[in-house]
């Protein structure tokens, strides 16, 4: 009995110390810890295909494929990495969310120097690329044997915000994208770094609400 109590008492301060050490990463004087969240909602010109969801996370970017659409996000001059990719589909729309995790829960940590942070605020570009996974040229044949070309690949200029650059393939009717870059230690430090936000939408020039449903990892 006494041995059990002794073991419990020994474990309690150790547990507290572990949590403190984890979040003490935010006390660094020469590093900042920034997080990123990218949300993409793409509506296609036809119902989604039944495909296997696939995702990939690489340095400074990630991608996800589902429903016949590949959504790729590259972070240029942002010094940030994604840790999770989630996706949700509904009839003719693909919803995707790319996020990072807190520095005390996941490696590699999104740490940067003050100079990197300044460059991020001035030069960070979130390059979003929507690519159709079906070659529509195979589906349209003129009676004289000449193939009909699909609509020209359309490049959407980054004239709405200062962070997002978006390229959308021919099968996408509408697209909405959000970007949030925030101080991961903002709730711990006395003075947090202001959050950077940007959005792009092709629907009436107004941002849609972010889908609240649960995103599945794939």
UniProtKB/Swiss-Prot annotation:
The keyword Glycoprotein applies. One of its GO terms (cellular component) is extracellular region. Gene3D superfamilies: Major secreted virus protein. Keywords: Early protein, Glycoprotein, Host-virus interaction, Inhibition of host chemokines by virus, Secreted, Signal, Viral immunoevasion. Glycans are attached at residue 70. Induction: Expressed in the early phase of the viral replicative cycle. Pfam families: Orthopox_35kD. Residues 1-16 form the signal peptide. It is found in: Secreted. InterPro entries: Orthopox_35kDa, Pox_vCCI-like_sf. May interact with several cellular chemokines to interfere with chemokine-glycosaminoglycan (GAG) interactions at the cell surface to alter chemotaxis of nearby responsive cells. Belongs to the orthopoxvirus OPG170 family. This is Protein OPG170. It comes from Variola virus (isolate Human/India/Ind3/1967).
């Amino acid at each position: 009995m006494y041995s059990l109590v002794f073991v419990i008492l020994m474990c309690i301060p150790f547990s507290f110390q572990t949590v403190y050490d984890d979040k003490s990463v935010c006390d660094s004087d020469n590093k900042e810890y920034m997080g990123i969240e990218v949300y993409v909602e793409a509506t296609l010109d036809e119902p989604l295909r039944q495909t296997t969801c696939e995702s990939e996370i690489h340095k400074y970017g990630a991608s996800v494929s589902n429903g016949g659409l590949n959504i790729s996000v590259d972070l240029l001059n942002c010094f940030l990495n994604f840790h999770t990719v989630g996706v949700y589909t509904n009839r003719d729309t693909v919803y995707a969310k790319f996020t990072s995790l807190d520095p005390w829960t996941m490696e590699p940590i999104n740490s940067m120097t003050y100079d990197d942070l300044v460059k991020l605020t001035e030069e960070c570009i979130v390059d979003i690329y929507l690519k159709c996974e079906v070659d529509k040229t195979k589906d349209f044949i003129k009676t004289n044997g000449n193939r009909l070309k699909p609509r020209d690949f359309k490049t959407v200029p980054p004239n709405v915000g200062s962070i997002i650059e978006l390229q959308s393939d021919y099968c996408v009717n509408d697209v909405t994208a959000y970007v949030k870059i925030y101080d991961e230690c903002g709730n711990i430090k006395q003075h947090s770094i202001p959050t950077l936000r940007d959005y792009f939408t092709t629907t009436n020039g107004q941002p849609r609400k972010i889908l609240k449903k649960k995103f599945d990892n794939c």
